[in-house]
From Swiss-Prot:
Cell compartments where the protein resides: Cytoplasm
Organism: Acinetobacter baylyi (strain ATCC 33305 / BD413 / ADP1)
Protein name: N-acetyl-gamma-glutamyl-phosphate reductase
Keyword tags: Amino-acid biosynthesis, Arginine biosynthesis, Cytoplasm, NADP, Oxidoreductase
Function according to Swiss-Prot or TrEMBL: Catalyzes the NADPH-dependent reduction of N-acetyl-5-glutamyl phosphate to yield N-acetyl-L-glutamate 5-semialdehyde.
Length: 349
């Protein structure tokens, strides 16, 4: 059995991670930490877990974490990098669900997160954890940076086009119009997240610049092998009055080659063997509720004009966009079937 530690167990991603791991046939959750709830039974805070765990929250103790096989950090940015070096030295694998190991560009990390990176040598050897695109590197990784939720929808939405043998799109003209449920903002109380601020309301945020923009740019450069062509991408996220779910609508200008290509077949072939990416029939409309609670991402393509392409990409922001993808990465790191513990079907309605 894989001995697991979770640092940060009271947030939405932390409890979602615990929910998934408690059902995992190869995992024992050894420790679950909280800065504020040490000594409290997990099931008392989250009644949905009653009968499934006797765990109590505990203070973060690095010596205890070093007895685990893998430690997940479901914490704010800046926490995992404080402990990664010591854990790696002790032979413990690390999966960070925050941003400490997403960006290889230290200047961009410090600019967007306002933190000086505490272990750049570990960052250099870490692997970006988008399972479908980096699985071979993830298998041998000691530290994995779990991707951001929005960047996951964008990368999987664009990868078949960017890795084609010929230029199919004009990358400098990409527009990403993304929407997320409010759970993406976390569980910490804040004025902007209360019911009366979000119910019956719909708003954009981070329009002048969002932390996921540099992550998207760096990742697309890696996928395509092209530098400097994605800097002008427009990315605008929105907050919608629902709890879970994320939909990214990606607008693309096609090259002449792209306009004359069978893009539906391109996507179907590219993702044919992927367990967690579903390419829907042409002109379908993927809905967030179809992936609620599941580690799945659904994609649909539209060509409203001969030289235009619209990509729709949906996922549960807490599962494929966070905790589920982290478990998927753990499975790869421990040479398990990638879908172990992740075969749940989306909830409907």
């Amino acid at each position: 059995m894989i001995s697991v530690g979770i640092v940060g167990g009271t947030g939405y991603t932390g409890v979602e991670l615990l929910r998934l791991l408690l059902r995992h046939p190869q995992v024992t959750v050894r420790v679950l930490t909280s800065r504020t709830e040490a000594g409290k039974r997990v099931a008392d805070m989250f009644p949905s877990l009653r009968g499934h765990t006797d765990l109590e929250f505990s203070d973060l103790n690095e010596d205890v974490l070093k007895q685990c096989d893998v430690v997940f950090f479901a914490t704010p940015h800046g926490v995992a990098m404080k402990y990664a070096k010591g854990l790696v030295a002790a032979g413990v694998k690390v999966i960070d669900l925050a941003a400490d190991f997403r960006l290889q560009n230290l200047e961009q990390f410090e600019k967007w997160y306002g933190l000086e990176h505490e272990c750049p040598e570990i960052l250099k050897d870490s692997v970006y954890g988008l399972s479908e695109l980096n699985r071979e590197k993830i298998k041998t990784a000691k530290v994995v940076g779990n991707p951001g939720c929005y960047p996951t929808t964008v990368q999987l939405g664009l990868a078949p086009l960017l890795q084609a043998d010929v230029a199919l799109i004009k990358p400098e003209n990409i527009i990403i119009d993304a929407k997320s449920g409010v759970s993406g903002a976390g569980r910490k109380a804040s004025l902007g997240m209360i019911y009366s601020e979000n119910a019956d309301n719909f708003k954009a945020y981070g329009v002048a610049g969002h932390r996921h923009h540099p992550e998207i740019v760096e990742a697309l450069e890696h996928i395509s092998g092209q530098k400097g062509v994605f800097d002008q991408i427009i990315f605008v996220p929105h907050l919608v009055p629902m709890i879970r779910g994320m939909l990214s609508t990606i607008y693309i200008d096609l090259t002449e080659e792209g306009a004359n290509s069978d893009l539906q077949s391109l996507y179907e072939i590219y993702y044919a063997n992927e367990k967690f990416v579903d390419v829907m029939p042409a002109n379908s409309s993927p809905e967030t509720r179809s992936v609620r609670g599941a580690n799945e991402l659904r994609i649909a393509l539209y060509k409203p004009q001969p030289n235009k392409l619209v990509i729709l990409s949906v996922q549960d922001n807490l599962v494929k966009g966070a905790a589920g993808q982290a478990v998927q990465n753990m499975n790869l790191m421990f040479n398990l079937d990638e879908d172990t513990g992740l075969t749940g079907i989306g909830l409907l309605p």
